[in-house]
Amino acid sequence: MDTRRFRSAMVGLVVLAPATLAPAGSATAQQTYTLRYAVDTERNINGLAQTVAERQGFFTREGINFQPVRFVATGNRPTDRTALVASRDTFDMARMQLSVLMEPEGRFKGTNYVAVSSVANNPAYFLVARPDIKTFADLKGKTLTEPSPSDPITLTARKLMETHGLKDGDVEIKTIAGSQPRVDCLKSGACAAGSLSQPSVFAAFDAGFHTLAMHIEAGPLLYVVDIVDRSWAETHSEVIVRYIRATAAAMRFIHDPRNLDEVVKAAVEITHQPESRAREMLSYFQDAKNDVLPKQGEIDTTAVKATIALFGQYGILKGPLPPPERFVDLRYAQMAGVQ
């Protein structure tokens, strides 16, 4: 196995019913909130902290009744995400790529959402290629499959190619939403290389594709975050704090090597992968240099600035570039004691 496969970098929504809040750790004395958490992906390892929080009782301890609501009806992420945004009245908090909030003409245009905690710092994405492509130079004249033009995965792929001497136009970029459809393009022969997440990347490895680079090599980012509507957040701050405390406890649990076997069980539950594959996925999380999973949900403003700068570099955002505060609000993580 290519050792570079072990060098890498990992969303949902909520509706809560009002109630009187009590201090952390006193769930028996407080009224429970039903938290409807909508997701636009299936079997995604980004749900690891939430699953661990459920399995280990961290949501219960904080008085949270966690109920996922899935926006995956069509299997096409852009379509499902459009449906999600149109269903504003069915959720209050969301797990989403930070970049989605930044897109000037994106699906969240005109909304009032802000990130309050981090789900995944650097993305666990692999730039893979068929066996005859040994170096980036071999990509010249080939077709590379990536997400949308404004997706940070596409942008970091472009940055990686530029770092290795390729110019715009040297490689044809075919945009396909979703890692599994990109795997299909690779296996069909229509695409020579592409960027894939876990666990879809394993199907590419099984088909003979190999890793050219990990996207983290393009530099640190803040990839996936929990977002809330600012107006709703102003009147539900303690609910947000409880949620952050529960997922922060889960992240600390995941980082503790003594809990590996329990974390593997959670990963198997989410991804429906065999235990051996779940352990392989988690190996990327355990490699500190990849900085995939936050220590406890904290937001790295330096990484936010880097993500904004990446959007500026490729013309998605025009200057002067906005400050991080336009997209993130640290107050809730601070109140939860994780920031």
What are these regions (language model features)?
Residues 97, 180-271:
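Pocket-lining segment of extracytoplasmic ligand-binding domains
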Residues 305-339:
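Conserved C-terminal helix/tail region of periplasmic/extracytoplasmic solute-binding proteins
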Residues 11-22:
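Bacterial N-terminal signal peptides
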Residues 55, 64, 106, 132, ...:
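Sec-exported extracytoplasmic/periplasmic mature domains
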Residues 30-167, 173-176, 182-185, 192-198, ...:
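Short, glycine-/small- and polar/acidic-enriched structural segments
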Residues 23-29:
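Sec/Tat signal peptide C-region and signal peptidase I cleavage site
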Residues 1-13:
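Bacterial N-terminal signal peptides that target proteins for export
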Residues 234-318:
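Secondary-structure end/capping motifs
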